[in-house]
């Protein structure tokens, strides 16, 4: 096992990356190795998908499946070795189907195909024991014995960034949004990474290409969500519980939440959101259901305690999943789509009957808590509608600065920085937030500036797109570059979605971003220095000193 893709990976003076019997996320060495094999097999699929475009051989089914399978290897998604093997064997079958069809078409059209990449040559046996034996060939750091560590680090930056983009591609696909050009670019990049590239400049360029592609993907996802559920609007959400049977929906998939709401109508079941599902309460086509009663719990790293105390059924629609056996709620947990845990019930399709039956069999909450309301729903339309008023307040000197404080949350005590930062931000500043990092401070009171709330919840991690649109609108209004705005991004990262959002911001030319709590372990000191110089990226330090530097700029 060697895994170094998330923020909590092992980092000591002598070791970087998880390389023991189990990773810090809880996945076993077996699952980690199988995920590497799956990724390598997917690079082989992309090789033939890219070659296929030379001879007009395109399989929509494979285009849509490949990013979904890649998503299964993201941090805290799938821990089930049998499911990962199924994905890998399906990749092998699709690769063979593509190769046969493409070679036949190339013969007919007399088209010259590229030389096979190492990933394209990679073949899987059918037996699990034989598959796992191939792990050394597929290791994400393959070649590290002879290649410079900077090359390995940049390969991983591109791989993990592309993995985050693939996750957003799958979220968009579920909502009916696909793009043939995005599929083509995805396959081109994935196939190229399967050649084990060694040019530092080309790898840096590739990371920017991934960032720009993800900007388009986030636009697609924004379209899918708003076309399906309406535009988010500022809405009050109860973060306390009420009496009754209950279902908890976690992850990111609004489609699944809608299906659950439809199928629980009239059954006396209250539905709660958890984690990144919080923004669901602001979408008109979701909040219209009266039994969508509130948001339960906080960020993903607290789920083992919070899920154990939830007296109903729990549905995990995407990342982030933790070991459910710790809190002994595995018998009430259901996984969806790419998510998996050994022994936990998995639901294919849109029939949630087993979830409903489970919820009805549980005790449910016995009494009503005193409600506590928070406000969500400052999505793209709401932000753009507020832009003229915001501009006026800036011109009048009532708003001095904007901070975007958000990203992934996690266990490390250093993450209290983000709580302290928002608490100490000047009272004439406005704080935008998104993703689960918001749970560090979103129940605190920030007041308003002449009717404009000082804390604006933009939404899920992918709703960085909305924040970018506001920044671009403000830059246009003030006739300045986006980096000349009184705007500072203070981001927390944990996994690969955060990596690709950072690449997107870099690719769009956004500079001066503060990131933490620690630097990605796969980036060497040399690479960090390059990124810091090129994009003026800063590491978080002391809140007081950072604020002083920001406001003095």
From Swiss-Prot:
It is an enzyme of class 1 (oxidoreductase). Keywords: 2Fe-2S, Cytoplasm, Iron, Iron-sulfur, Metal-binding, Oxidoreductase. The keyword Iron-sulfur applies. Its cofactor is [2Fe-2S] cluster; hybrid [4Fe-2O-2S] cluster. It comes from the Bacteria. Its EC number is 1.7.99.1. GO terms for cellular component: cytoplasm. One of its GO terms (molecular function) is peroxidase activity. Binds 1 [2Fe-2S] cluster. Binds 1 hybrid [4Fe-2O-2S] cluster. InterPro entries: HCP/CODH (IPR004137), Hydroxylam_reduct (IPR010048), Prismane-like_a/b-sand (IPR016099), Prismane-like_sf (IPR011254), Prismane_a-bundle (IPR016100). SUPFAM superfamilies: Prismane protein-like. It is found in: Cytoplasm. Catalyzes the reduction of hydroxylamine to form NH(3) and H(2)O. Belongs to the HCP family. This is Hydroxylamine reductase. The gene is hcp.
């Amino acid at each position: 096992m060697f895994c170094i893709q998330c923020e909590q990976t092992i980092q000591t003076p002598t070791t970087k990356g998880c390389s023991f019997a189990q990773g810090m996320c809880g996945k076993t060495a077996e699952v980690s190795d199988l995920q590497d094999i799956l990724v390598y097999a997917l690079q082989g699929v992309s090789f033939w998908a890219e070659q296929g475009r030379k001879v007009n051989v395109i399989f929509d089914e494979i285009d849509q499946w490949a990013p979904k399978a890649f998503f299964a290897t993201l941090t805290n998604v799938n821990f089930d070795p049998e499911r990962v093997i199924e994905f890998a064997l399906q990749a092998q079958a699709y690769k063979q189907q593509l190769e046969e069809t493409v070679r036949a078409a190339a013969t007919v059209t007399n088209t010259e195909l590229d030389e096979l990449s190492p990933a394209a040559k990679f073949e899987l046996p059918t037996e699990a024991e034989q598959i796992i034996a191939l792990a050394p060939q597929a290791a994400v750091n393959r070649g590290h014995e002879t290649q410079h560590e900077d090359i390995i680090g940049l390969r991983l930056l591109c791989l993990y960034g592309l993995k985050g983009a693939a996750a957003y591609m799958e979220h968009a696909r579920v909502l009916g949004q696909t793009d043939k050009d995005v599929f083509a670019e995805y396959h081109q990049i994935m196939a190229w990474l399967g050649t084990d590239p060694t040019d530092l400049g080309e790898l840096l360029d590739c990371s920017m290409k991934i960032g720009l592609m993800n900007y388009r993907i986030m636009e697609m996802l924004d379209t899918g969500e708003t076309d399906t559920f309406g535009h988010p609007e500022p809405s009050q959400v109860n973060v306390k519980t009420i009496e009754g049977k209950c279902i908890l929906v976690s992850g990111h998939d609004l489609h699944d939440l809608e299906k659950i709401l439809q199928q629980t109508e009239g059954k006396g079941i209250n539905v709660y959101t958890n984690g990144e599902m919080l923004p669901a309460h602001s979408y008109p086509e979701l909040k219209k259901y009266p039994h969508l009663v509130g948001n339960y719990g906080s960020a993903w790293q607290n789920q083992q305690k919070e899920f154990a105390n939830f007296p109903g059924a729990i549905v995990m629609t995407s990342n982030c999943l933790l070991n459910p056996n710790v809190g002994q709620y595995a018998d009430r947990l259901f996984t969806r789509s790419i998510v998996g845990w050994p022994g936990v019930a998995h639901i294919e399709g849109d029939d949630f009957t087993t979830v409903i039956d489970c919820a009805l069999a549980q005790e449910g909450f016995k009494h009503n808590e005193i409600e506590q309301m928070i406000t969500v729903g400052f999505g793209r339309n709401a932000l753009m509608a507020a832009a003229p008023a915001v501009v006026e307040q800036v011109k009048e000197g009532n708003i001095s600065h904007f901070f975007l404080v958000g990203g992934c949350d996690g266990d490390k005590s250093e993450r209290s920085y983000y709580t302290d930062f928002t608490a100490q931000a000047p009272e004439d500043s406005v704080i935008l937030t998104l993703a689960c990092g918001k749970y560090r401070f979103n129940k605190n009171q920030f007041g308003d500036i002449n009717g404009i709330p000082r804390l604006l919840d933009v939404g899920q991690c992918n709703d960085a797109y909305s924040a970018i649109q506001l920044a671009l609108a403000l830059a246009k209004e003030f006739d300045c570059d986006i980096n000349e705005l009184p705007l500072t991004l203070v981001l927390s990262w944990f996994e690969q979605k955060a990596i690709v959002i950072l690449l997107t911001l870099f690719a769009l030319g956004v500079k001066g971003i503060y990131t933490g709590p620690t630097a990605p372990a796969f980036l060497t000191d040399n690479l960090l220095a390059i990124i810091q110089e090129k994009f003026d990226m800063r590491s978080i330090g002391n809140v007081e000193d950072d604020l002083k530097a920001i406001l003095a700029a």
